[in-house]
């Protein structure tokens, strides 16, 4: 295995992909690429501009003139820039969470962002998380992980995340939103959410994030010894 393999982490909303990928990238000294944040940035712009989320040609035109950049700040945290503006916090709002799947299903939007993501991974040594990384964006990634958890557990995690930002959402409502997002993500024509054939599936419903990170680090270490 390459000493700086690309690591693809896929999974449904609320599975803990971002947390695992962030900790893993710090542990290995790799670049962390949050592809979901890139789609959220485009969704935020669509909301701001009043673009109908059912208007796929309109969303395609919007994506074509949108710049999304990812940078790591001095504390090692990922910052998301939309046309030069730091929108790291705003893209996590409930409104964007509802809109993002509708934006991400548009083929032209995905094609634009996939091109940017592949360019960032071309030198190896990235931890990239999303919903079609192992199947579409980086099908040749040396390590592929499909991280999942029960809808109830994912809803609980997402509620806690939103509460920390000042948004209070009912558990039943959140389970329904998670379930609907799963339906949209798994049935879309472009890059549907499915595990890659050679992905390791990890159910972290009752597994601490530190254990998940150790499992993946062990895989990287084992690969380097081969």
From Swiss-Prot:
Known catalytic reactions: CMP + ATP = CDP + ADP; dCMP + ATP = dCDP + ADP
Location in or out of the cell: Cytoplasm
Stretches assigned to coiled coil: none
SUPFAM superfamilies per record: P-loop containing nucleoside triphosphate hydrolases
Domain of life (superkingdom): Bacteria
PANTHER family per UniProt: CYTIDYLATE KINASE, CYTIDYLATE KINASE/PANTOATE-BETA-ALANINE LIGASE
Species for this entry: Pelotomaculum thermopropionicum (strain DSM 13744 / JCM 10971 / SI)
Name used for this protein in its record: Cytidylate kinase
Main location: cytoplasm
């Amino acid at each position: 295995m390459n000493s700086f393999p690309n690591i693809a982490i896929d999974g449904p909303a609320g599975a803990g992909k971002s947390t695992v990928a962030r900790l893993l990238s710090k542990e290995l000294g790799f670049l962390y690429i949050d592809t979901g944040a890139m789609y959220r940035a485009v969704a935020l712009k669509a909301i701001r501009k009043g673009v109908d989320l059912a208007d796929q040609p309109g969303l395609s035109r919007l994506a074509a003139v949108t710049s999304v950049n990812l940078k790591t700040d001095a504390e090692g945290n990922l910052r998301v820039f939309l046309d030069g503006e730091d929108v790291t916090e705003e893209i996590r709002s409930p409104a964007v969470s509802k809109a993002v799947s509708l934006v991400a299903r548009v083929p032209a939007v995905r094609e634009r962002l996939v091109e940017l993501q592949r360019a960032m991974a071309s030198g190896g040594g990235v931890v990239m998380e999303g919903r079609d990384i192992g199947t579409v964006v980086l099908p040749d990634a040396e390590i592929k992980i499909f991280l999942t958890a029960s809808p109830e557990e994912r809803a609980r995690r997402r509620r806690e995340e939103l509460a920390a930002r000042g948004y209070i959402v009912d558990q039943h409502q959140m389970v329904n939103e998670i379930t609907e997002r799963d339906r949209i993500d798994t049935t879309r024509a472009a890059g549907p959410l499915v595990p890659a054939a050679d992905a390791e599936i990890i159910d972290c419903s009752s597994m601490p994030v530190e254990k998940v990170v150790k499992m993946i680090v062990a895989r990287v270490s084992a690969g380097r010894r081969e």
